């Protein structure tokens, strides 16, 4: 009883820590971790209800709460357990598409999509198990489970038992193993490619999320940007059709983000001109200001690192500032040359970020824990369909408890494989709430 109670308590605390960590730490609020949040919800329910009711059943030696509570407990237990498996499948597929479709999948990979997938996992698990467990006695016309016992009635049918074991465990495990093999292979291939590929052969423009910043010097006579300041973005070497305008005031920077590489340019004290470079077809319209006293030109290109779990690459920051003692024509030429130079400059590729390794490592740990803890019970289920007396009750109990222990192990997997989870857990346990939302 003491061991079972301790396991239940550790499971509850561990999974509450996971859920609270994701809630309070913005660096953990990623699509992948939302799937882990759903998994933690399932594990928490197992720790609160399933473990304690099963302990009661095994310690007393019979089921004391009647057939209705028995069926409700079994339905909850199997729905939640199946939801855990479905969440693991979702996590594996999500990682697989991140690695194999890095350009198209991240666009679709939104919080809304994650919520829909999580909801589908729970609804499907409920449909698969709850009606069959609760209403099987009415389908066959009789309840065959004896008083004082609690088990799923249709498990007495060997064919049904075999089919549910295949669908609930063996098939998902095969799918997840194959997916992880592809994930590992694709990740290694990318690492080798990044090491072998010389910088000169890399694309001149990086397909990352780039943030253009426009800074305008203070001038008391300066009109609003709506009157006389125009900004154009250069995207992938070509000017877009519509100009992008932003308000620039003292001490303020306006930011604009786009999924393609972009350069925002501002030039003051210049006449409208278009400068074209044939090699990369880079063109920009340099803005016009009514104020003749302003003599500073500033171009800044910055990359913005999105909050994600390594489905999107990141780059560096480049800043170019023009001098203030030149006439308009000279400024125009300087601005145009620097824009062209920056758009032609090869992007330096970095090795896959540590966050990507964290995610892959976490998934591997979760899958291994799931397979190791769930395999004994599901092997016994298959044996039981052919030879019921072959498995003693004690072995059944151990196998069943191993499935529950998986819910205890999962939070430890997150902490061991992800330093951010580990640090956030530590802050929560030690009541260090200051700056916990920014813990990395």
Swiss-Prot record:
Modified residues (Phosphothreonine): 420, 424, 439
CDD domains, alphabetized: 7tmA_mAChR_M2
InterPro entries for this protein: GPCR_Rhodpsn (IPR000276), GPCR_Rhodpsn_7TM (IPR017452), Musac_Ach_M2_rcpt (IPR001065), Musac_Ach_rcpt (IPR000995)
Stretches assigned to the Cytoplasmic side: 20-33, 94-113, 184-361, 417-440
Motif Important for signaling, residue range(s) on this chain: 94-96, 410-414
Extracellular face residues: 55-71, 137-158, 385-392
Stretches with biased composition (Polar residues): 258-267, 278-287, 308-327
PTM comment text: Phosphorylated in response to agonist treatment.
Region Disordered, annotated ranges: 192-329
Protein name: Muscarinic acetylcholine receptor M2
Organism: Pan troglodytes
């Amino acid at each position: 009883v003491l061991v079972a109670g301790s396991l239940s308590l550790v499971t509850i605390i561990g999974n509450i820590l996971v859920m609270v960590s994701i809630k309070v730490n913005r660096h953990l609020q990623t699509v992948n971790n939302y799937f882990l949040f759903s998994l933690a919800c399932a594990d928490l329910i197992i720790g609160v209800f399933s473990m304690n009711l099963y302990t009661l059943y095994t310690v007393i030696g019979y089921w004391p709460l009647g057939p209705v509570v028995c069926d409700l407990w079994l339905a909850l237990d199997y729905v939640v357990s199946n939801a855990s498996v479905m969440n693991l499948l979702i996590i594996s597929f999500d990682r697989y598409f991140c690695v194999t479709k890095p350009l198209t999948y991240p666009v679709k990979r939104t919080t809304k999509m994650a919520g829909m997938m999580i909801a589908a996992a729970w609804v499907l698990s409920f449909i698969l198990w709850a009606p069959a467990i609760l209403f099987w006695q009415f389908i066959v016309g009789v309840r065959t489970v004896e008083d004082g016992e609690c088990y799923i009635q249709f498990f007495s049918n060997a064919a049904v038992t075999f089919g549910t074991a295949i669908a609930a465990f063996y098939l998902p495990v095969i799918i997840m193993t194959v997916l992880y093999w592809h994930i590992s292979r694709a990740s290694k291939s990318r690492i080798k490619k990044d090491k072998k590929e010389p910088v000169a052969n890399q694309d001149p423009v990086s397909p990352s999320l780039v943030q253009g910043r426009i800074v305008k010097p203070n001038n008391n006579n300066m009109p609003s940007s709506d009157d006389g300041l125009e900004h154009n973005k250069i995207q992938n070497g070509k000017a877009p059709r519509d100009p992008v305008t932003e308000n620039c005031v003292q001490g303020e920077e306006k930011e604009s983000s786009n999924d393609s590489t972009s350069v925002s340019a501002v030039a003051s004290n210049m006449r409208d001109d278009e400068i074209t470079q044939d090699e990369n077809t880079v063109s920009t319209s340099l803005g016009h200001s009514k104020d003749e006293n302003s003599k500073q030109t500033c171009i800044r290109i910055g990359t913005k690192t999105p909050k994600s779990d390594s489905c999107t690459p990141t780059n560096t920051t480049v800043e170019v500032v023009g001098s203030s003692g030149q006439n308009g024509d000279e400024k125009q030429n300087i601005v145009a040359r620097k824009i062209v130079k920056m758009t032609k400059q090869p992007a330096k590729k970095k090795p896959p970020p540590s966050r990507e390794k964290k995610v892959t490592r976490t998934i591997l740990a979760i899958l291994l824990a799931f397979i190791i803890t769930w395999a004994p019970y599901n092997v016994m289920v298959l044996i039981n369909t052919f030879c019921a007396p072959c498995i003693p009750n004690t072995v059944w109990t151990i196998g069943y408890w191993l499935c529950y222990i998986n819910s205890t192990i999962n939070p430890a997997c997150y902490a061991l494989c992800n330093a951010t989870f580990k640090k956030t857990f530590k802050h929560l346990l030690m009541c260090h709430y200051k700056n916990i939302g920014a813990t990395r």
